[in-house]
């Protein structure tokens, strides 16, 4: 079917943020345009943060008029901004009538954007604020890449943040926001391809990290789709504890998750094959030195580093953060096993932007059965 007839029939414009370079090539080919048009459009979108065809000076007037009829460049809208005392920024972005949250973390020579992949999350981890919100749906490509685009656009417009003209102001992107990325793997990987593309944001693979609670089939799929650093949200040294705090462990237990991580490490080159293990420290739950010994033994033979994460308070969740003494004792044990381990610095806790605190606003919750994951 002719592209413009299709759009006329369904009365819906094509959002160009949903398309990677290959898809844009097909799109412009169907319009009878040369392949270089896709490159021009991508430069305007991702290098100049332009969402108005009228300002694209090297696009012909006739093509501009045609694009205005059938296409749009539409990213999520920021409806609220919160600034932490440590410089972290949290943006609430509107998706339909719901909200997702995206976090910008500036450091000395590094800036990290924490991106969401779903509206809510279906996994129900008992210590996580996102899980308490329930789950509505996966984000599409434009809603994922749109978070990056909107953040970069806003930062470049902010004269208080020193950025060279039109330079991409983000050095690292982590898929650690709302949702489980591997349950939305097709859209997430498509968005990552745009981030990596020279006509997109031109970020290096080693500066993107995807975090998963351990969706084993997703880990296997990911390594065949794209080679990027992987983080495993483990949070327990054994199945007894993990079953209690992470229900997904009843579907994919620790052994199966770590075996998938081991294979990912062997079959990928990003981050030199090293996996990041994330471990939130919950007082009197998983923070004993015996747990540290168990964890170290579980990780034997897997090239990895461990991020120990102080638990951040979340309303209506009855956990507490480990004491500094217990955290340091836990760290000391892991270092004795020669495992690279750090205690992650808390950022953005005063605006509920720290690890596990993102909630957004989820309506029309959907219950997913674990056998469908």
From Swiss-Prot:
Transmembrane regions listed in the UniProt entry: none
Protein name per UniProt: Dual-specificity RNA methyltransferase RlmN
Record keywords: 4Fe-4S, Cytoplasm, Disulfide bond, Iron, Iron-sulfur, Metal-binding, Methyltransferase, rRNA processing, S-adenosyl-L-methionine, Transferase, tRNA processing
Gene Ontology CC: cytoplasm
Cofactor dependency: [4Fe-4S] cluster
EC number: 2.1.1.192
Entry superkingdom: Bacteria
Role, per record: Specifically methylates position 2 of adenine 2503 in 23S rRNA and position 2 of adenine 37 in tRNAs. m2A2503 modification seems to play a crucial role in the proofreading step occurring at the peptidyl transferase center and thus would serve to optimize ribosomal fidelity.
Catalysed reaction equations from the record: adenosine(2503) in 23S rRNA + 2 reduced [2Fe-2S]-[ferredoxin] + 2 S-adenosyl-L-methionine = 2-methyladenosine(2503) in 23S rRNA + 5'-deoxyadenosine + L-methionine + 2 oxidized [2Fe-2S]-[ferredoxin] + S-adenosyl-L-homocysteine; adenosine(37) in tRNA + 2 reduced [2Fe-2S]-[ferredoxin] + 2 S-adenosyl-L-methionine = 2-methyladenosine(37) in tRNA + 5'-deoxyadenosine + L-methionine + 2 oxidized [2Fe-2S]-[ferredoxin] + S-adenosyl-L-homocysteine
């Amino acid at each position: 079917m002719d592209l413009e007839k299709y759009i006329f029939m369904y009365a819906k414009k094509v959002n160009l943020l949903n398309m990677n370079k290959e898809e844009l090539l097909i799109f412009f080919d169907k319009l009878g345009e040369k392949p270089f048009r896709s490159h021009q459009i991508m430069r305007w979108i991702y290098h100049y943060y332009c969402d108005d065809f009228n300002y694209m000076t090297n696009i012909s007037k006739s093509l501009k008029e045609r694009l205005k009829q059938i296409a749009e460049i539409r990213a999520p809208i920021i409806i609220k901004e919160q600034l932490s005392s440590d410089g972290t920024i949290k943006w609430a972005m509107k998706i339909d009538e719901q909200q997702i949250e995206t976090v910008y973390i500036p450091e000395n020579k590094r800036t990290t954007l924490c991106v969401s992949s779903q509206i809510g999350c279906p996994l129900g981890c008992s210590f996580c604020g996102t899980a308490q919100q329930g789950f509505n749906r996966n984000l599409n490509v434009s809603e994922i890449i749109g978070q990056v685009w909107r953040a970069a656009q806003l930062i470049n417009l902010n004269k208080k943040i020193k950025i060279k003209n039109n330079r991409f102001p983000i050095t690292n992107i982590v898929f650690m926001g709302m949702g489980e990325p591997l349950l939305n793997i097709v859209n997430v990987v498509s968005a990552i391809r745009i981030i990596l593309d020279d006509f997109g944001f031109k970020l290096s693979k080693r500066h993107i990290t995807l975090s998963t609670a351990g969706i084993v089939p997703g880990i296997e799929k990911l390594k065949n789709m794209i080679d990027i650093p992987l983080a495993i949200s483990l949070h327990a040294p054994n199945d007894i504890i993990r079953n209690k705090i992470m229900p997904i462990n009843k579907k994919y237990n620790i052994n199966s998750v770590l075996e998938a991580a081991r294979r990912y490490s062997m079959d990928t080159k990003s981050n030199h094959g090293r996996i990041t293990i994330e471990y939130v420290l919950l007082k009197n739950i998983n923070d004993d030195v015996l747990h540290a010994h168990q964890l170290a033994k579980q990780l034997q033979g897997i090239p990895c580093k461990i991020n120990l994460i102080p638990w951040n308070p979340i309303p209506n969740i009855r956990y507490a953060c480990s004491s500094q003494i217990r955290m340091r004792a836990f760290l000391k044990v892991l270092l004795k096993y020669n495992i690279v381990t750090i205690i992650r610095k808390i950022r953005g806790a005063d605006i509920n932007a720290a690890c596990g605190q993102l909630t957004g606003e989820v309506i029309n919750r959907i219950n997913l059965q674990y056998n469908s994951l």
